[in-house]
C-alpha cells in the first residue's frame, strides 16, 4: 500500500484517503513516504501505484530483487492474452421453452404435505396439533449425504 505525506499539514495519508484529505487541506500536495518522490501538481500521485519496498530502500546495494522482471513477465502475459483472444461474434439467441417440473408432494401418515424446497419452519407453522408436531420432528432423520429425510414408519 502506498502512503503519502501531505506537505502542507505534515499529515500521513494512505492513498485511499487522499481525496478525503483534500476537504481538510485544499492546497495539499503529497510526497511518497517510501521513495520520497514529491507530487506537486496535486493529481499525478494517482498514477503512483507501485513503489520500492522497505528492503530495497534500506538495503540499497545489498538488495537483490526481481521486481522489474516480474512486472515485465506480467506485461508479456497480458499481451499474449490479448493476442490469443478470439473476436467474439454475436450469436443468435435461441429461446427455449421453459418447462416447469411438477413439484413432488409427499404426504405423511399425519396428513402433512411435504413440498421439495419448502422450509421446515413453514411446514411446522401449518400444523396446529402440538402432538403431531412432536411426532413429525421425531420422525426426521439425517441420511448419509447429510440431508434431512422424513422416515416413514
Swiss-Prot record:
Keywords: Metal-binding, Nucleus, Repeat, Zinc, Zinc-finger. Pfam families: zf-LYAR. Residues 65-83 have a biased composition (Basic residues). This is UPF0743 protein YCR087C-A. Belongs to the UPF0743 family. Zn(2+) 1 binds at residues 6, 9, 21, 25. A zinc finger (C2HC LYAR-type) spans 1-26, 27-52. It comes from the Eukaryota. The lineage of its organism: Eukaryota, Fungi, Dikarya, Ascomycota, Saccharomycotina. It is found in: Nucleus, Nucleolus. GO terms for cellular component: nucleolus. It comes from Saccharomyces cerevisiae (strain ATCC 204508 / S288c) (Baker's yeast). Present with 3430 molecules/cell in log phase SD medium.
Amino acid at each position: 500500500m502506498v502512503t503519502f505525506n501531505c506537505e502542507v499539514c505534515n499529515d500521513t495519508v494512505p492513498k485511499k484517503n487522499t481525496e478525503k484529505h483534500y476537504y481538510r487541506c485544499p492546497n495539499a500536495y503529497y510526497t511518497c513516504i517510501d521513495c520520497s518522490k514529491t507530487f506537486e501538481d496535486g493529481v499525478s500521485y494517482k498514477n503512483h501505484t507501485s513503489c520500492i519496498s522497505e528492503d530495497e530502500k534500506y538495503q540499497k546495494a545489498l538488495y537483490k530483487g526481481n521486481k522489474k522482471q516480474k512486472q515485465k513477465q506480467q506485461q508479456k502475459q497480458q499481451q499474449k492474452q490479448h493476442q490469443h483472444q478470439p473476436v467474439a461474434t454475436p450469436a443468435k439467441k435461441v429461446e427455449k421453452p421453459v418447462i416447469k417440473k411438477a413439484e413432488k408432494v409427499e404426504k405423511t401418515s399425519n396428513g402433512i404435505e411435504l413440498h421439495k424446497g419448502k422450509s421446515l419452519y413453514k411446514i411446522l407453522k401449518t400444523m396446529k396439533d402440538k402432538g403431531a408436531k412432536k411426532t413429525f420432528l421425531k420422525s426426521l432423520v439425517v441420511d448419509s449425504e447429510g440431508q434431512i429425510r422424513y422416515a416413514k414408519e
